[in-house]
Amino acid sequence: MKISRQAYADMFGPTVGDKVRLADTELWIEVEKDFTTYGEEVKFGGGKVIRDGMGQGQLLAAEVVDTLITNALIIDHWGIVKADVGIKNGRIAAIGKAGNPDIQPDVTIAVGAATEVIAGEGMILTAGGVDTHIHFICPQQIEEALMSGVTTMIGGGTGPATGTNATTVTPGPWHMARMLQASDSFPMNIGFTGKGNVSLPGPLIEQVKAGAIGLKLHEDWGTTPAAIDNCLSVADEYDVQVAIHTDTLNESGFVETTLAAFKNRTIHTYHTEGAGGGHAPDIIKACGSPNVLPSSTNPTRPFTRNTIDEHLDMLMVCHHLDPSIAEDVAFAESRIRRETIAAEDILHDLGAFSMLSSDSQAMGRVGEVIMRTWQTADKMKKQRGPLPQDGPGNDNFRAKRYIAKYTINPAITHGISHEVGSIEVGKWADLVLWRPAFFGVKPTLILKGGAIAASLMGDANASIPTPQPVHYRPMFASFGSSLHATSLTFISQAAFDAGVPESLGLKKQIGVVKGCRTVQKKDLIHNDYLPDIEVDPQTYQVKADGVLLWCEPADVLPMAQRYFLF
């Protein structure tokens, strides 16, 4: 029996050779592989396959998956494939072909009476986003991020304190304990960074032992060469990451001074272009160092006609500056440069900038990491054309490069890629399901640890789930002890060994960071280009390996107003 390709796609979703448009962008992906056996596809519903004795077998709960996502189109750094995805005990158990092994061939995921089904036909499945630049200013950020498809948040803060409004720092053991206890209340994987700005090791060590998964160096606390060297030394000893916001004013040295202070040790440079902060005008040079793991924050993503004007006001508020003081205004203006922001677009497209994050409420929007990543990809395709690695008529490599920026690469950087960051067997089942027309903008379903934590949902008093008003609502994995079973709190190995979870009475699952200090840029997937960067100190023009980097600002973006009328 044969059916048309269109009929097949309508019934089971696209298969090999079919192309899917991502939202209203000009990005097209093509299915590279389909794990199904044609004619043996499983689908749930009245008169469908997953019924007793048909696609559902007689095996006990221990032998079948807890949850099955059927016929989903996976976009991940490793491929763009169609598959069934099985989840067991909160982790991804299998990616392959589901069904009843008693009567169906090639089954790699057994379905039984203990199996729940989520229909993935015609849907896109991605790993939950990993945002590694969080100012924990208000707890409401967490729900906002979750509803956008982010499932892991790393950063620092204590609430709307002036220090937190400017820096991603949870300072000292007392604040660290309070924030770890607070994190038990949220369906989100969370890790906190301590204050790295001190020139002796003791105050840093006590923060790591209290639970910090990393240390943050920020110019507002004094990012001197001595503080940098001390912080990296402690990080090397305790296997935690260091994130840095460098010295915009060049008071304690220039970009060359800071790079020398790194002494070839691994470090995550925040907003490496510089609008978010850093040596003016040439912190962007850092992305050419093999030990530097560079990221952007989302307000400069992508470069548009409004980017410059918006940034000046943002900066004055976030860094406690006074518009009546000439030096404060000069400080702000030194950070906002059209030329370096334009270059940032291109450096992302070349894979020289490896990650993208939010800078939540502190010159960044916590719910727009994913959207702005794909807006940047779309702008670059329109302005630069297909990448050399892309296949004919598709943007598969570009899609893999850009999705890696907010999933696997930040997870690798912060030592949590053994738990999250990709759709791979054994990892925590933090998964996001999207309708292609809403991809990157509004997810349909967000799973945490294999359970549904958030979803689009209609009127709770309606006779079916879909009547308006349809909006995002927390689901059962966001409540009670289910929340604790399906989300992770990340801490250092030193804190784990010291019994911090027990002493603080933490209830969520505990993840331990590891491998932070051996990561090099070459380890960041699809984003490991090491250009030789030059910045003209007068014109701010940027060159990479001798090539001028300039692109025009966008007047119109996809994934924007047409999606937010309601």
Swiss-Prot record:
<dbReference type="Pfam" id="PF01979">
    <property type="entry name" value="Amidohydro_1"/>
</dbReference>
<feature type="modified residue" description="N6-carboxylysine">
    <location>
        <position position="216"/>
    </location>
</feature>
<keyword id="KW-0378">Hydrolase</keyword>
<dbReference type="InterPro" id="IPR032466">
    <property type="entry name" value="Metal_Hydrolase"/>
</dbReference>
<feature type="binding site">
    <location>
        <position position="135"/>
    </location>
    <ligand>
        <name>Ni(2+) 1</name>
    </ligand>
</feature>
<keyword id="KW-0963">Cytoplasm</keyword>
<protein>
    <recommendedName>
        <fullName>Urease subunit alpha 2</fullName>
        <ecNumber>3.5.1.5</ecNumber>
    </recommendedName>
</protein>
<feature type="binding site" description="via carbamate group">
    <location>
        <position position="216"/>
    </location>
    <ligand>
        <name>Ni(2+) 1</name>
    </ligand>
</feature>
<feature type="binding site">
    <location>
        <position position="245"/>
    </location>
    <ligand>
        <name>Ni(2+) 2</name>
    </ligand>
</feature>
<dbReference type="InterPro" id="IPR011612">
    <property type="entry name" value="Urease_alpha_N_dom"/>
</dbReference>
<dbReference type="GO" id="GO:0043419">
    <property type="term" value="P:urea catabolic process"/>
</dbReference>
<comment type="similarity">
    <text>Belongs to the metallo-dependent hydrolases superfamily. Urease alpha subunit family.</text>
</comment>
<feature type="active site" description="Proton donor">
    <location>
        <position position="319"/>
    </location>
</feature>
<dbReference type="GO" id="GO:0009039">
    <property type="term" value="F:urease activity"/>
</dbReference>
<comment type="pathway">
    <text>Nitrogen metabolism; urea degradation; CO(2) and NH(3) from urea (urease route): step 1/1.</text>
</comment>
<feature type="binding site">
    <location>
        <position position="218"/>
    </location>
    <ligand>
        <name>substrate</name>
    </ligand>
</feature>
<dbReference type="InterPro" id="IPR011059">
    <property type="entry name" value="Metal-dep_hydrolase_composite"/>
</dbReference>
<dbReference type="InterPro" id="IPR017951">
    <property type="entry name" value="Urease_asu_c"/>
</dbReference>
<dbReference type="InterPro" id="IPR005848">
    <property type="entry name" value="Urease_asu"/>
</dbReference>
<comment type="subunit">
    <text>May form a heterohexamer of 3 UreC (alpha) and 3 UreAB (gamma/beta) subunits. May also form a heterotrimer of UreA (gamma), UreB (beta) and UreC (alpha) subunits. Three heterotrimers associate to form the active enzyme.</text>
</comment>
<dbReference type="InterPro" id="IPR017950">
    <property type="entry name" value="Urease_AS"/>
</dbReference>
<dbReference type="GO" id="GO:0016151">
    <property type="term" value="F:nickel cation binding"/>
</dbReference>
<feature type="domain" description="Urease">
    <location>
        <begin position="128"/>
        <end position="566"/>
    </location>
</feature>
<keyword id="KW-0533">Nickel</keyword>
<dbReference type="InterPro" id="IPR029754">
    <property type="entry name" value="Urease_Ni-bd"/>
</dbReference>
<dbReference type="GO" id="GO:0005737">
    <property type="term" value="C:cytoplasm"/>
</dbReference>
<dbReference type="InterPro" id="IPR006680">
    <property type="entry name" value="Amidohydro-rel"/>
</dbReference>
<dbReference type="InterPro" id="IPR050112">
    <property type="entry name" value="Urease_alpha_subunit"/>
</dbReference>
<dbReference type="Pfam" id="PF00449">
    <property type="entry name" value="Urease_alpha"/>
</dbReference>
<keyword id="KW-0479">Metal-binding</keyword>
<feature type="binding site">
    <location>
        <position position="271"/>
    </location>
    <ligand>
        <name>Ni(2+) 2</name>
    </ligand>
</feature>
<feature type="binding site">
    <location>
        <position position="359"/>
    </location>
    <ligand>
        <name>Ni(2+) 1</name>
    </ligand>
</feature>
<feature type="binding site">
    <location>
        <position position="133"/>
    </location>
    <ligand>
        <name>Ni(2+) 1</name>
    </ligand>
</feature>
<feature type="binding site" description="via carbamate group">
    <location>
        <position position="216"/>
    </location>
    <ligand>
        <name>Ni(2+) 2</name>
    </ligand>
</feature>
